[in-house]
Amino acid sequence: MRDAFARTIYQLAKEDPNVFIVVAYISPAASMATFQKEFPDRFINIGVAEQSMIGMCAGMAMRGLKVFAYTIATFAAYRPFEQIRDDLCYQNIPVTVVGVGGGVAYSSLGGTHHAQEDIAIMSALPNMSVMAPCDPLETEAATLACSRLRTPAYLRLGKSGEPILTANASEPFEFGKSRYLKKGNGTCILSYGPIMKMAFEVAEKMERMQKTVSIISIHTLKPLDRGGIAKALKTYSEVIVIEEHSERGGLAVQVKQIAWEEKASCRLLTFSLEDKFIHTYGSQQDIWKAHGLSRDDIFYEISTAKRRVRWLKSIS
């Protein structure tokens, strides 16, 4: 995803001399190398000074520049939170804060690098838009969308190596709108970010059981497409939410609220990171598994829930 972001921002910079990147001690090697080489005056590495990075970006944007603040997600969202709130959101300054390695992408680096609450924190800020694309193609589209906003935005990216999932999407990318990546009947999965690949793996396993599954990308977490989610809750008999975020303040909580408000009668199952600090050591997939977010764990819970419903019906 970071390479897709770098390619897109480079193209934007070729077309618009007002595009700047400010990074906090992120190596320009690989993804950012071309941008830095061709536009050295528009690539600023401020060092380990994330609060100053946000303040600087706010001032640059007030002078008419189109600024992207880029660093590892925990250091993009948590360390400079006061500056994001007061310098950007309070004054409604159009700066895009880019958090790379959202969720537990930087798995083995430990808790300081696990962004498991960032969606909740950024979504709580007035004027802030929040996007979390699921693959490189959505990353390109989300980056372009951020460049057009006249408000602050938080763009949560994965790291690298994410598969292409949206090449055959049923609907185009549109800021603030959910979209179908595939259509089926009966069951619908809502997801976002790199863990979307798990949604496809779960759907594939369900379809071996002669089930057709819809998958919807909730790439924009704020403003949330409440209408699109409400429609899914009313259309399908079973709705599943899969996310790489704490169960507190993420997509699952909001879907549950919409389901309650809409009096939806579907079976709703949610799968999130547990509400605790992560002490598991291993890869991103290892941590997913430890939190019940592997393909087999999710499929087992779905199957168990269905058996439980059938049993309750048999004794009622």
Task: Please give the residue ranges for each predicted region.
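Thiamine diphosphate
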Residues: 1-156, 161, 172, 311-316, ...
